[in-house]
Amino acid sequence: MRKSICWRHLLASFALVSLALTASAIAADKVQLTIDASKAGAKIDRNIFGQFAEHLGHGIYDGIWVGADSPIPDTRGIRNDVVATLKALKVPNVRWPGGCFADEYHWRNGIGRRRNVTLNPNWGGVVEPNTFGTHEFMDFLNQIGAEAYVSVNVGSGTPHEAADWLEYMTAPTTTTLAKERAANGHASPYKIAYLGIGNESWDCGGNMTPDYYVSQMKIYSRFVRNYNPAQQDKDQMLKFAVGPGGAEPRFVDWTEAVMKAYQQHTWSWDINGLSMHSYTVVRWQDKFKSLGFAESEYAQFLKETLTMDGLINRYSAIMDKYDPQKQNARLAAARIGRKRLGQRCNGGLEVSLLKFGEAEVEICSPGNLGLRASAFL
């Protein structure tokens, strides 16, 4: 069963290696690299190629979703070219809804024939039509052959709301919520492989203190249940708590609080991992271009990603202190690239490494196609 996987088992990992050679070294030595494709190498976990979709720029609307009346070729409103690309990449999982949007998302706005039109205050106050909701997301996953990583609203939502959402998605059609799901077009329960308990709760997810988040984490872990009969014994849903957000000292306190709670967990609640986010910042203002950026800018971006190793070691040490046997949780170390290579295509490029839960990479194309990748380490 999945719950037996140890903390240190990385669900996914993006490896970015930067070699800095001085001009004199290049002149003095000739570097030769040989790759023997005939020999088997290390096994790479498929979850490294996971994706992450956020309601930001054209990442969802026009990027994944164009609607049934669009001139762009689509299947039930989902772009065929995006599906073909992600199927070719063999994407294993997609996290949604992501980013600050996740803690202001109310799932009932995105189901049924009549959708509530709201605003997205995190990204310019743009109109959120909610035409891409639960069923559209799950249809998207089915089309590309990926598993669901659902992030529930802890910041402005309630445990009751999150519990209802999971029941709506996963229960057999013996309950009222499951019958509503069936009436909306999907009779069989959905499979939810991963559950995120909030997003960056130390910042836009609610500006919570460590102790307050821990109290919420326990409640959500207890009452947000997966009812899918196929996931009761095997393929059980994994629950990820919000982890640290970089190298600031306050995130040591945060990780200590979450891991101390994990060490003392009882039969009634549990978590399976932490999600660590770290922003690769070259410059917040005057972001680099998505396309046509300079080689020196790309080198700066790669250099910044190397700090992830130190963060993984720092927070792994804290995890080891409270879970020395590495029994039942993993660190999702997410390297989020805020170089903003994707600003020019309304989304940007975000690179995330997740040691214990997810990695995020947003990819932009000239056609305003915005996608993100969410991988597990």
Model regions and ranges:
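Hydrophobic residues within membrane-embedded alpha helices
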Residues: 9-12, 142
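Active-site His/acidic residue clusters
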Residues: 281-299, 351-353
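Non-catalytic accessory regions flanking glycosidase/transglycosidase catalytic cores in CAZymes
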Residues: 25-273, 304-348, 355-377
